[in-house]
């Protein structure tokens, strides 16, 4: 339903951010580990976060960023924050 398509929309946005960084043929999945698989450093991660904050008009505190392990965590978090 609507949640699923919102989830998909957020995922596509995150996927686009990652592919801008890693190359357009980079395969992004929900269980990719942000730090291990993506080797995202804190600067890249902050760029993603700031982009998401602006795109969805939300605020993501540092402790929540630290708690995000995978791409899926990031997508779920944004979904939760925006579906109030």
Model-predicted segments: where are they?
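Thiotemplate assembly-line natural product biosynthesis machinery
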Residues: 4-27, 79-84
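C-terminal structural segments of small proteins and small subunits
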Residues: 67, 72-83
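Phosphopantetheine carrier-protein modules
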Residues: 19-39, 56-67
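Short active-site alpha-helical segment characteristic of glycosyltransferases
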Residues: 48
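Two-component histidine kinase catalytic core, primarily the HATPase_c
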Residues: 44
